[in-house]
Each structure stands twice: as structure tokens, then as C-alpha cells.
Amino acid sequence: MQPDHRKKSSVEVDFFTEYGEGSRYRIEEVIGKGSYGVVCSAYDTHTGEKVAIKKINDIFEHVSDATRILREIKLLRLLRHPDIVEIKHILLPPSRREFRDIYVVFELMESDLHQVIKANDDLTPEHYQFFLYQLLRGLKYIHTANVFHRDLKPKNILANADCKLKICDFGLARVAFNDTPTAIFWTDYVATRWYRAPELCGSFFSKYTPAIDIWSIGCIFAELLTGKPLFPGKNVVHQLDLMTDMLGTPSAEAIGRVRNEKARRYLSSMRKKKPIPFSHKFPHTDPLALRLLEKMLSFEPKDRPTAEEALADVYFKGLAKVEREPSAQPVTKLEFEFERRRITKEDVRELIYRESLEYHPKMLKEYLDGSEPTNFMYPSAVEHFKKQFAYLEEHYKNGTSHNPPERQQHASLPRACVLYSDNNHPVAQQSSAEVTDGLSKCSIRDERPRGADRNAQMPMSRIPINVPQTIQGAAVARPGKVVGSVLRYNNCGAATGVEALEQQQRRMVRNPAAASQYPKRTQPCKSNRGDEDCATAAEGPSRLKPNTQYIPQKVSAAQDTAMSRWY
């Protein structure tokens, strides 16, 4: 039976939203599970969109974890931008003072940049340019709000098949104010070492600075170019060795700014190293791209460009118009007053409840007027979802992916945890032994054919969603991989792309589907991929027919490894 897409009256929609939101979302299946709780895909009957509902269990067991959740949902409410993942809704808890779980509705993204890099060995210079452009544009917006992400890495960059990227995971982000101390102790700073700026190596003390995020973006861009991490250090010493092997020994002044004493002594005693020319490290790469990358990877933080300066670089000539790109209003101190004092479990519970009210205007008005009851007089959607989540989670643990009885008749729902570009491929089932727990995000082990090597230490992730297949005469890709240019190739070339991109920049869109347009330049496969990519690379590059139109679909992962991701 087809869903009813008839437009409801405004009165009906308001009532449906406030008092019937349990019927708004049709739960479909479990798409991720971790120590935090469970994530289910769902269908939003209001908008007709696929969404992901994340249930976070026992969030107040540890105040630090609850504070991180509060920080993220608050920042994602304040930072509304096409290059930042969007929270669409937060379900109102059944009780203001006693709730333990929360349900957050995110937009559903198909993959992340980590999977894109693994699955595509024939990304073009246009992909590199457009990916970096989006990252810097989103980062400019974040930094103009005086927010610093602090944990940028490929797995925290979500991706869709139209080459749209979105920054996510703001749990470690911080807001800087004018009276912020010169040195901050990052008690929860556990960001991945590989993307950590050198001034942070071995030290949890650092001043809030945009240069930390710029370094991370540089590492991500370098990984796009080579297909493997640039500085995969095993420990702090190894990390410094890898950095200096490529960038050369830093100056005495730069070493003096490293806060960790042991790291300073190690760098001072290190033999003098000459920097490796970036053209040798990244052969066949646009010199303009390398010049910008070299700036972003400067050892000295003061030598790195800001996101706005990077967008103005000649590398983006004809693509970016910095003056048209949106900036954010600085976040006010009042929003993050809780960061400046010690808060209790009851404090953070009230603050999270207050955040959820932002998505319920009528209840928010009652709350602000002081007329809102502690216990609600209508059934909460949370109670409605608890049963469905429990049913799905039970079958998920048992190695099946059945839908609830009332949903099993719908044959068009997303299937198990592997995404195939070949619709005739049998659907793989997932056993409980394959579930990776204890991750901070939705995590499902991705599977490879037997004999294919994998990095056992790499957390496996991402969930299923239907990726649009190539159309209009697109070249046939190898099984499991959908390929295409950054945007439809046409005779208009780059001019069309700039015009389309300007239109996207001038408006805030919830699900942008347009990227830049320009002719595709053929790029040979990367030959220096890591072992984990050998099985994919062995199949050979996909061949694209010349002068053919194709839509942008570089995101889909290789056969048996593709996962989509919630958010």
C-alpha cells in the first residue's frame, strides 16, 4: 500500500506533531547498535523522507557522557548549515524528571568519507576539489560561531551518492569566548591521534584555535589524494617521527610552542630532517592543490590559513565566492553556561529536556510560561517506540533483521546490513557475533568476501539505504560500486557548475542534491593503497565511456563492504 502523501491542514499537522508524533515515524529496522543504544531507520510520514532515530540508553549514568550528548544536540541546533548534519526532531520524553533515554531523529546519510576513500580508487581531481571545498565551507561556518570541532576525521564526515558531505559528531567540540583561559585542559580529548595537530601531541593542554581543525582537514585531504592516512602514528613518538619525516625538523621557535615537555625534548634532540617536496609525496596532483595542502599542514599553527582564507585560495577559483558563503552568529555564553560550572545529574537532565522542547513549540511556550506539568497528560511517542525498538533489537541480537509484524508486508524496506549495487545479489544476514559494541556511533561490522584482507582494528560501521543507480547511459561499474563524476557532464562545462553552486550557496537547504558541474578529468587508479584495499583494487578501475552523461555517485562502497550511516 502506497503511503498517503496528501497534505494535512496546518491545524492537523500541529496537533499531529505535538500529541501524535508516535504515529509520525514508521520504524523499519535496526541499522546500528553500540554501547550507547540502538539506531533504527524510519519513514517520516510528514515529509516522506527516510530518517534515522537514535535511541540513547541510560544517558545519565555518567554525567560526563550526558554532558557530551547535551553539547552535541545543542550545537547541532545552533549550527544550521548545508555542510553540517541536521537533527530533525527530538522526541519528547514521557516524564520531565524521570526519563533516562532520549530519541533523536537525524537525517539519514548513505556513507562516510572513510568508506568513500576505501571503496573508490578512481576519484578525480574534481572530486578532491569539491570535497575540500565543502569541508572548508562548513568549517568556516563553524569557526565564525566561535566553535571548534576538535575531532575531524573521515569517519566524522558523512557522505551521500551525490558527493554531498556533512560534518558530524560535535561531542568533543568547544565554544571559545573572549575570556577563555589561554590554556585549556581537555579532560575528554580522545580524538584520533592520526588527525591531531602537532601542538597537541602528548599534551592535553592547548589554547582553542581554528588551526587545530585546519590541520585535521589537511590530513583528510591528503588521505583523499593517496587513499591512506597521512600520519598513522602508533604512539606520540611515532606520530612526531612521521610528521617530521615529511615536513622536516621544525624550527626552535616552533618546538618551543609544543606544550608537552617530553615532546619538546624529543624534537630538540632529533637529527635534522629535510622536508619532502609535496610534489614527490603526491605525484600527478594539481600543483594548486598541493600549495594549499602545504599551508594547511604547516607545523606552526600561525602559518596555517583560516577556513575563509583557504576558500579564497586560487585553487578554488571559479568555484568559491567567499563573500556569498554564509557565516554564523557567535554562540552566546548563555547557551553554554553549563560548561563553566560543575553540574549534577539533575541539572543535565533538565538541560536536555529543555533542548528537546526546542522541537515542540507549544510545549516550549508552556514551559516558559511556567504552566507545563511535570507528568504529561497524553501518551508520549517514546512509549510507542519502546515496544518497536525492543522487538527489533531482540531480533537484531539473534542474527536476524526481521521487521515488526505490522511492517513485514512492506517489501520495499531497506534490507540487511550490506548494500549491493546489483539488485539481484542475495541479501546477507548478520549474526550477533558480527555486531561491534562499545562504539560512540552506530556501528555495524561490514563484511568482505573471504580472502579479502581487512584492518581488524578499524571500527566497522554504516547502515543500509537505497543508493540511486546510474542512469541515462551511465557506464557499467564493477559489481557493488556505483561510479560517476562530481555532477552530470554536459557541454556547458564549468560555467554550469559555478552557476549551480552559487544557487546552493544562496540558500539553506535541508537535503542538498546539487554539487558543482564541470568536465571530468580521467584519473588513474591509486597504486599505493593500503593492504585493506587490495581486494577492491584488484578488481580494476571502473571504465567510463567518453562523452557520456552520468550522475554523481562516487559514494557507494565496494561489494559486501558498503554500509550507510545514520544521522
Curated annotation (Swiss-Prot):
Positions of the Protein kinase domain: 25-316
Keyword Cell wall biogenesis/degradation: no
Residues where Phosphotyrosine is found: Y189
Residues annotated for ATP binding in this entry: I31, G32, K33, G34, S35, Y36, G37, V38, V39, K54
InterPro entries reported in the protein's UniProt record: Kinase-like_dom_sf (IPR011009), MAP_kinase (IPR050117), MAP_kinase_CS (IPR003527), Prot_kinase_dom (IPR000719), Protein_kinase_ATP_BS (IPR017441)
SUPFAM superfamilies reported in the protein's UniProt record: Protein kinase-like (PK-like) (SSF56112)
Catalytic residue list: D151 (proton acceptor)
Motif placement: TXY: 187-189
Residues annotated with Phosphothreonine modification: T187, T192
Ranges of Polar residues composition bias in the record: 545-567
Molecular function in Gene Ontology: ATP binding; MAP kinase activity; protein serine kinase activity
Protein family membership: Belongs to the protein kinase superfamily. CMGC Ser/Thr protein kinase family. MAP kinase subfamily.
Class of the enzyme per the UniProt entry, highest EC level: transferase
Posttranslational mods: Dually phosphorylated on Thr-187 and Tyr-189, which activates the enzyme.
The name this protein goes by in its record: Mitogen-activated protein kinase 16
Catalyzed reaction equations: L-seryl-[protein] + ATP = O-phospho-L-seryl-[protein] + ADP + H(+); L-threonyl-[protein] + ATP = O-phospho-L-threonyl-[protein] + ADP + H(+)
